[in-house]
Amino acid sequence: MIQPKPCSVLSLDIGDKRIGIAGCDPLGISITHLPAIFRDSFEKDLKEFEKICFDRRVEGLICGNPLDMNGMETKQSIRCKKYGIKLAKCLKLPLAFINEHCSTLEAKEKFSLKNDKTGRLDSAAAAILLQQWLIEGPDLDDSN
């Protein structure tokens, strides 16, 4: 695995009700948990992401891909990939997917966020994905 070139990215933990968000600085040194987006229509979600991306000068997106224990796609992973690709195209940003298997469980344990309905758990999971991406990659792909 190749460590990606550091840049300001958003990491997304895409769920049916909320999208957890974490971001990093352009050097990839600090990771910030951001407020989760409570999902609505794609158009409303997009407006929120446009503002976040503008404010943070985002250069790419990392999306969690919830593969099963064997690394195979699931119904949820297919939905996440479709959403991530559509969002990246609309925002004109490169995109990378990272296996998010057990990221929510890890976030629950690491940040003591059991039974959270506020979105903090989702954003904590996004932060774990971002930390994993900063170490392992893959590089962002702008061919979306």
UniProtKB/Swiss-Prot annotation:
A GO cellular-component term linked to this record: cytosol
Gene Ontology molecular functions: nuclease activity
Q: List localization entries.
A: Cytoplasm
**Keyword set for this entry?**
Cytoplasm, Hydrolase, Nuclease, Ribosome biogenesis
Checking Gene3D superfamilies in the record gives: YqgF/RNase H-like domain (3.30.420.140)
The Gene Ontology biological process terms listed for this entry are: rRNA 5'-end processing
Record-linked CDD domains: YqgF
> Is Nuclease among the key words of this record?
yes
Q: Which Pfam families match?
A: RuvX
- Per UniProt, the enzyme's principal EC class comes to hydrolase
The organism's place on the tree of life at top rank = Bacteria
Q: Which InterPro entries match?
A: RNaseH-like_sf, YqgF, YqgF/RNaseH-like_dom, YqgF/RNaseH-like_dom_sf
Task: Give the Enzyme Commission number.
Answer: 3.1.-.-
Family as reported in the entry's similarity comment: Belongs to the YqgF nuclease family.
Q: Which purpose does this protein serve, as stated in its record?
A: Could be a nuclease involved in processing of the 5'-end of pre-16S rRNA.
Q: What is this protein called?
A: Putative pre-16S rRNA nuclease
Q: Which organism is it from?
A: Prochlorococcus marinus (strain NATL1A)
Ranked from the top, the taxonomy reads: Bacteria, Bacillati, Cyanobacteriota, Cyanophyceae, Synechococcales
